[in-house]
Amino acid sequence: ISHRFTYRNRMISTKAIVLRTLRYSDSRLIVSLYTEHYGMITSMVRIASSSRGRGGIAIWQLLNILELNVDFRGNSDFQKIGEVCITAPWKDIPYNPVKACVSMYLAEFLYNCLRNEGENAAIFSFLENSLCWLDETEKGIANFHLVMMLKMTRFLGFWPNTDEYCKTGYFDL
């Protein structure tokens, strides 16, 4: 008796933030993404070799917010990604050297904080809003990374008690 299995298209659309890219070969990247519906996932993606090809390396720039289709298989180390598009193209982050440095630092920080984190819509929303604010803001970003890290502590389960704040006090772990 032969059995024929029909697999439905299991691609699910989700938003994702690029946290790490690693060149695997001339035509492939290993990307780590924090997604809205699955938390941290890793995928091997093919990049276009020609300048006119779709899906070039620019779409996988650190902290890009993407809309993608994922065939999520919980038992697999690498998830299969279908269509990908940038939801909010950065206007200033890639072109402003200060913001570019801050974004590289934050990508590394977030990767290390979230690599074992599961699905958390509140974290994803916080990150998406914070990154959009960074891109749109002209001034006052000198301490953005510090404020963002401080606010992330609440999501990670520890945060400073500021109820008894005084000017001579300081945060000491």
Where do the protein language model's features map onto the residues?
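Extreme N-terminal basic, low-complexity initiation segments
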Residues: 1-6
